[in-house]
Curated annotation (Swiss-Prot):
A GO-annotated cellular component: plasma membrane
UniProt-listed Enzyme Commission number(s): 2.7.13.3
Name of this protein: Sensor histidine kinase TrcS
Key word Nucleotide-binding present: yes
One of the GO biological process terms: phosphorelay signal transduction system
Top-level taxon of the source organism: Bacteria
Cofactor annotation comment: Can use Ca(2+), Mn(2+), and, to a lesser extent, Mg(2+).
Other observations noted: Overexpression in M.smegmatis mtrB background reverses the mtrB mutant phenotype including the expression of the MtrA-regulon. TrcS interacts with MtrA and is capable of phosphorylating MtrA in vitro. These results suggest that under certain specific conditions in vivo, TrcS could phosphorylate MtrA, independent of MtrB.
Amino acid sequence: MIPDRNTRSRKAPCWRPRSLRQQLLLGVLAVVTVVLVAVGVVSVLSLSGYVTAMNDAELVESLHALNHSYTRYRDSAQTSTPTGNLPMSQAVLEFTGQTPGNLIAVLHDGVVIGSAVFSEDGARPAPPDVIRAIEAQVWDGGPPRVESLGSLGAYQVDSSAAGADRLFVGVSLSLANQIIARKKVTTVALVGAALVVTAALTVWVVGYALRPLRRVAATAAEVATMPLTDDDHQISVRVRPGDTDPDNEVGIVGHTLNRLLDNVDGALAHRVDSDLRMRQFITDASHELRTPLAAIQGYAELTRQDSSDLPPTTEYALARIESEARRMTLLVDELLLLSRLSEGEDLETEDLDLTDLVINAVNDAAVAAPTHRWVKNLPDEPVWVNGDHARLHQLVSNLLTNAWVHTQPGVTVTIGITCHRTGPNAPCVELSVTDDGPDIDPEILPHLFDRFVRASKSRSNGSGHGLGLAIVSSIVKAHRGSVTAESGNGQTVFRVRLPMIEQQIATTA
């Protein structure tokens, strides 16, 4: 069956940050990453635009200088000056106005008739692969573009017509690409370093800011482990004043928790006071009821001594009065015992042999319920515990009585004693009472040791007041032990664990 969507706990996906520290850290890193990446991208694009503009300007200046040098060369050729007599392949090397890295060429009918690559050491003819790359393109005076020119790499190139020839210029992009690449590497490194520093600072700042919240949580966890069921317990733990400042969110949580603890502490004190008054009332009422009940029972017995002179209906009525007076007296005695045990009545403790006590109790039960089969699974040697003999005998008797009263004849009841050096409440002595009668209703099982609780109809014959197991639980608690009940698959087991004394520990070592 699928739990209701309003009550079932929703488990967060494994990819989702679970702690507030992780959420804050990832949130800050996400925001800082977006901002730094945006700034880095803008700076790289800005630098790229600036370098491109510089290359465009240099390309225009280079083409202008080539036009000027080409015009002077043609004018010199018409006046038969020494420069004008040089072939174009030589004259191009003498052209001026070019910066290192620039490439110029003069084409005639798509064929390079002169070229020069400028450097710090002067001009030299363009390599053959560069010339082939230039001649492979169609230069029709379009806008500047980027071309890969063989061994020289990427160039931003342009051309213009000059009579029957075409002038070609190219500005190297090697330096510009290096600058942009270096800028990208620097930006990535700075973004990474900034993220590392931001993460470290965020972890420290968030950890410092959340310390009050952790202290508040520690206070709540401490209260959660307190035994609030004790009558004399008070919640003395509070969030310290420094963590209850209402001007911040953590302080609001701490202040609210203190108010909650005050309210719970007051409610517990009120409950304890009510319980104490109720116990005192039960004790007083039990004391007051014992005398009139004894009188009723006594007068009924006294009157029945002359039963031969009484009508049958009167005889029957007196018998019922006497029987119900006994039941009422037993109920009052049990309530009085429970009240005394709840108030922490001092026990008359001594070291006693639990095995001998159980044997006597089983023998009494076998006489009271001969229709049941009684099996003793007891050790041969004595098992020593420290306790009140009368109370422990009543504990065992109540468990055995519960076994035969609430089961049909023929049921097997097994009583066992085991010494445990490990496990729950160890070292301890475990007394178990097992029967193969009907199972106890699972809905009743968790409340089996409460007052006035009876087993399911399949195990109940209608007798009893529902106080026997409550007395068992109180006696066990008074002896610093524990009692549990299990029922299922045609078997019901009651287990009582009592502390093992040093003498028994030495015996079982």
